[in-house]
């Protein structure tokens, strides 16, 4: 699936991933391939990304919104 993380300053990440963990406002959650469509708010914390070549990346955010549809995740964050 494709993950795109956009901040006011730049595109922080864009690429193929196998899983992503988010700091949701109601608690952390993980999105895997073929996840049901979802829109959720995010709180301050870390986004943990597992890429298709099994590398882990972590990005700190202050909050934001995530949308997942058709195996594409878009995150708008601070």
Where are these regions (language model features)?
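Compact, glycine-rich, soluble single-domain proteins
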Residues: 2-78
């Amino acid at each position: 699936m494709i993950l795109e993380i956009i901040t006011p300053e730049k595109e922080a990440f864009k690429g193929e991933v196998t899983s992503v963990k988010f700091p949701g406002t109601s608690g952390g959650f993980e999105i895997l391939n073929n996840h049901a469509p979802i829109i959720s708010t995010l709180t301050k914390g870390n986004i943990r990304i597992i890429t298709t070549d099994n590398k882990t990346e972590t990005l700190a955010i202050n909050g934001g919104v995530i949308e997942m549809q058709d195996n594409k995740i878009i995150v708008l964050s601070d």
